[in-house]
């Protein structure tokens, strides 16, 4: 039998014929390791001198001939499971029909071995059959960390360890993972941790890696000393540092826990210096930290030496530019830093970025702004100099999108304000990034610039798909709503097309009589809504929405049932402004009023809602009895001397409106330039609409000016929210928010029908917190809830970032709002009383009645959290308003907390799924 074995590292006597090998009686060497291969190669060294080479040539007369056995007839792989034969063929680069070549096979074996999956690889050749033999490494079937953390924390550690399920087992990789785990634990503040590694065989060639962690203790900085500091307080000095002195009750949110973060300690000196430079101390010098640790108590003292120097003010600001593509006056006007200001390094950086933006918006993407300082130490003055190198005009070469596993490229491209061949613009680049974030499709968005040459640039758009679909079910119980079930299916990015769809249903069984005067089963509700929205029809700036809805609910004072449909067409004006026009047809029926007197607001003047009620004086009754006559009923209005106790009450309209039909057109305008969907830090949001039900006319309502309905009015409404991140001013993660809204209902004459459920009510998360949703309302002389013909609310909020990793914030708020209504008598504008004298027929009619207002205010705290279920707000409000008296002689001046005004106040609210 003719046989040749080829090692991965050496081929012995390749020029010796197969016959010579057999005649020599030598046996093929099975070289299975680099060490053995090296030893064998030394034994089979080629002859070193000419005589030896001649003798070798005599012994191998057929060395220049290729025997048939050396031609490859087939290739096979023995013991290979990590990859397919096809992939192995691509790696070895040997094909059937090739002539056996030692170097080629050696290269092939090494290429296979270098894949990292095998302990050893060798090749054999017999009868034209080339076989590669593999001894594969074990696979990692799983990685477990025992003795530390939650599953989320463990996943975070595993990502840092560089070892995961499916990897090949490797001792060096294992040791690296062990070291990385210890380092990660130290980074979290745990020192002296012990990590032991063990392996468990799961199956043949599969191992479970278990890291047993004996977590060390945290070291706390009990005291931080800044020797030489006199002009800044310790808390200010430490404001940017990762390592700070532990506060009293430091475990509470918002306080310094004092944990030692050793991996950040070397950078804290620079952070402290930056704090000083933000306050004008340009000569400040901070020593390297000295840490003294007591491992018996796990307490530490942190010591720095500080040289503060003098505080500098800005004497002058100069701008030097090599190519004045933007006028110097324009650049100077854009700067925030002013002469005579205390120098602030943060403002210097911000102004450098402003100058960069001004130049880059003209297309000069590679412009460089180099700030320089000219100090006058004697007088404590500094001259700020900005040197600008403009560079070449830059155009976009290509836009490369990655990370969108579900969302199609065109959905992303249509939000970008820059495309191939466009002139570069930095502001448009940032707006494009913000526009992608506002979609709410992605959890991460980043646009990077890649330079092609001095005049071309690629834009690399990297996104990470977020949760755009929601399937929610809720179950709860409340004193008002009873057993509550709700469910919704919504998708903001349907099949990756950018379209949105939602199906919503809400059911509440009702909790009975929660408050005096409410109908039995108050709180019972069923509501359903189906909507489909395409925000960009055919990738144009036009959008469309179709929705169907129906509802049945027992409200505070009546039962409402109805339904309808709506269609809407809109258009984007730029990338921030949206305008739409929609049509809506709604049929609503109100019944089951808590008081029959509510019928007067749906009935005609010909219908008696409540008959006249009378009483007979006692003297008349006694006289009739003494005369032997039949006594009259005390409540009879026909008896002689009867006194009217309650007049006859009729409806107020010219016809019956118990089932009104509303046919309306709505014009809507919205604007949004915020930088995030859920947690905006900067920017404004504005939206407004005008709904015209019927056509304006001073005459009687008919089918034409009612647009097919019998409701006629124009309702205008707008809301505005502004956000500003105060971190650059206060050095803490604090967001200031201001939100306001206002609306009014205009009617053309006092006979135009106005539904009670279309007026404005206050109370709840979206208006004035601390009052039950929709429970603040003007009342008529009978105490009936009418709502207002106008509304205005304003809210101020300060939101502090408590846990950045958990996306949790704590906010303080102050809410104020009022509702307007008409009364028959003149009086002061603000009119707070348990019972007002609102005249509903005059609502919204210019010149009819007198405009009054009832106002409320509240303050409190709220916790804001992007939870796994979505945005969640927990609200703890305190309601108050100004009341001059409580009806019992007790006077109140100024702001009165929780007065007795028959308001339904509450001290806890929550909201899910809304923007903050």
UniProtKB/Swiss-Prot annotation:
Residues 29-41 have a biased composition (Polar residues). Residues 70-137, 138-214, 219-309, 312-391, 394-466 form the POTRA domain. Keywords: Cell outer membrane, Membrane, Repeat, Signal, Transmembrane, Transmembrane beta strand. Residues 42-58 have a biased composition (Basic and acidic residues). It comes from the Bacteria. It is found in: Cell outer membrane. It holds the Pfam family Omp85. InterPro entries: Bac_surfAg_D15, BamA/TamA_POTRA, D15-like, OM_assembly_BamA, POTRA. GO terms for biological process: membrane assembly. Residues 21-70 are annotated as: Disordered. One of its GO terms (cellular component) is cell outer membrane. Residues 1-20 form the signal peptide. NCBIfam families: OM_YaeT. Belongs to the BamA family. Part of the Bam complex. Part of the outer membrane protein assembly complex, which is involved in assembly and insertion of beta-barrel proteins into the outer membrane. PANTHER family: OUTER MEMBRANE PROTEIN ASSEMBLY FACTOR BAMA, SORTING AND ASSEMBLY MACHINERY SAMM50 PROTEIN FAMILY MEMBER. This is Outer membrane protein assembly factor BamA. The lineage of its organism: Bacteria, Pseudomonadati, Campylobacterota, Epsilonproteobacteria, Campylobacterales.
């Amino acid at each position: 039998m003719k046989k040749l074995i080829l090692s991965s590292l050496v081929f012995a006597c390749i020029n010796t014929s197969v016959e010579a090998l057999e005649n020599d009686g030598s046996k093929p060497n099975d070289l299975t390791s680099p060490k053995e291969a090296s030893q064998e190669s030394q034994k089979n060294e080629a002859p070193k001198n000419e005589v030896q080479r001649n003798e070798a040539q005599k012994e191998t007369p057929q060395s220049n001939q290729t025997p048939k056995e050396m031609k490859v007839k087939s290739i096979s792989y023995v013991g290979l499971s990590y990859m397919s034969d096809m992939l192995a063929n691509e790696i070895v680069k040997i094909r059937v029909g090739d002539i056996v070549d030692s170097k080629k096979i050696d290269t092939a074996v090494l290429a296979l071995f270098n894949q990292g999956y095998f302990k050893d690889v060798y090749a054999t050749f017999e009868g034209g059959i080339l076989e590669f033999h593999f001894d594969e490494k074990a696979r990692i079937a799983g990685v477990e960390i025992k003795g530390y953390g939650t599953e989320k924390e463990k996943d975070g550690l595993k990502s840092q360890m560089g070892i995961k399920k499916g990897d090949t087992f490797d001792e060096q990789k294992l040791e690296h993972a062990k070291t990385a785990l210890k380092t990660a634990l130290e980074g979290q503040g745990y020192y002296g941790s012990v990590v032991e590694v063990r392996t468990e065989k799961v199956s043949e060639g599969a191992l479970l890696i278990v890291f047993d962690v004996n977590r060390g203790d945290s070291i706390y900085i009990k005291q931080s000393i800044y020797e030489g500091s006199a002009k800044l307080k310790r808390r200010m000095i430490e404001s940017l540092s990762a390592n700070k002195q532990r506060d009293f009750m430091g475990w509470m949110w918002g306080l310094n826990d004092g944990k030692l973060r050793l991996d950040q300690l070397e950078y804290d000196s620079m952070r402290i210096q930056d704090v000083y430079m933000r306050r004008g101390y340009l000569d400040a010098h901070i020593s390297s930290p000295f840490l003294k640790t007591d491992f018996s108590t796990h307490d530490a003292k942190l010591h720095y030496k500080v040289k503060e120097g003098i505080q500098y003010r800005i004497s002058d600001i100069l701008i030097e530019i090599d190519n004045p593509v933007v006028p110097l006056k324009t650049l100077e006007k854009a700067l925030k830093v002013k002469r005579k200001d205390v120098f602030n390094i943060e403002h210097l950086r911000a102004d450098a970025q402003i100058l960069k933006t001004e130049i880059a918006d003209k297309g000069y993407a590679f412009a460089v702004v180099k700030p320089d300082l000219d100090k006058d130490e004697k007088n404590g003055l500094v001259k700020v100099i900005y040197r600008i190198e403009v560079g070449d005009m830059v155009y976009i070469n290509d836009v490369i999108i990655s990370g969108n596993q579900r969302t199609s490229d065109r959905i992303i491209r249509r939000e970008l304000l820059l495309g191939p061949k466009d002139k570069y613009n930095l502001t448009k680049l940032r707006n494009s990034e913000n526009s992608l974030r506002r979609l709410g499709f992605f959890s991460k968005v980043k646009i990077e610039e890649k330079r092609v040459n001095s005049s071309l640039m690629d834009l690399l758009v990297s996104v990470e798909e977020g949760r755009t679909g929601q399937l929610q079910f809720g179950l709860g119980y409340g004193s008002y709503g009873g057993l509550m079930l709700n469910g919704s299916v919504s998708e903001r990015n349907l099949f990756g097309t950018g379209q949105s769809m939602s199906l919503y249903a809400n059911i509440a069984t009702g909790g009975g009589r929660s408050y005096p005067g409410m109908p039995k089963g108050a709180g019972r509700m069923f509501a359903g809504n189906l909507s489909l929205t395409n925000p960009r029809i055919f990738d144009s700036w036009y959008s469309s929405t179709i929705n169907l809805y129906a509802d049945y609910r027992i409200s505070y004072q009546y039962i409402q049932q109805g339904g309808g449909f709506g269609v809407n067409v809109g258009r984007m004006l730029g990338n921030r402004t949206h305008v739409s026009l929609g049509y809506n047809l709604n049929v609503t029926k109100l019944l089951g009023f808590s008081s029959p007197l509510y019928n007067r607001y749906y009935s005609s003047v010909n219908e008696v809602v409540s008959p006249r009620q009378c009483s007979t004086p006692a003297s008349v009754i006694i006289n009739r009895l003494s005369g032997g006559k039949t006594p009259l009923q005390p409540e009879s209005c026909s008896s002689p001397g009867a006194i009217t106790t309650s007049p006859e009450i009729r409806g107020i309209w010219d016809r019956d409106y118990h089932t009104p039909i509303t046919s309306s057109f709505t014009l809507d305008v919205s604007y949004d330039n915020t930088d995030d969907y859920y947690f905006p830090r900067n920017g404004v949001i504005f939206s407004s609409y005008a709904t015209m039900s019927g056509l304006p006319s001073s005459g009687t309502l008919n089918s034409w000016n009612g647009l097919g309905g019998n409701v006629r009015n124009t309702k205008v409404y707008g809301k505005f929210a502004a956000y500003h991140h105060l971190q650059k001013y206060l050095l803490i993660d604090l967001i200031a928010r201001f939100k306001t809204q206002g609306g009014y209902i205009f009617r053309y004459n006092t006979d135009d029908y106005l539904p009670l459920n279309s007026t404005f009510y206050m109370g709840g998360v979206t208006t004035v917190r601390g009052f039950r949703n929709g429970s603040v309302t003007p009342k008529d002389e009978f105490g009936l809830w009418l709502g207002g013909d106008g509304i205005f609310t304003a809210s101020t909020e300060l939101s502090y970032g408590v846990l950045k990793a958990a996306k949790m914030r704590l906010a303080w708020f102050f809410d104020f709002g009022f509702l307007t209504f008409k009364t028959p008598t003149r009086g002061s504008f603000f009119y707070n009383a348990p019972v007002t004298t609102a005249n509903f027929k005059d609502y919204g009619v210019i010149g009819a009645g007198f405009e009054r207002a009832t106002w409320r205010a509240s303050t409190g705290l709220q916790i804001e959290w992007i939870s796994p279920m979505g945005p969640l707000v927990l609200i703890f409000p305190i309601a108050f308003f100004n009341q001059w008296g409580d009806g019992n002689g007790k006077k109140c001046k100024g702001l009165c907390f929780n007065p007795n005004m028959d308001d339904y106040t509450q001290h806890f609210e929550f909201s899910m799924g809304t923007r903050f």
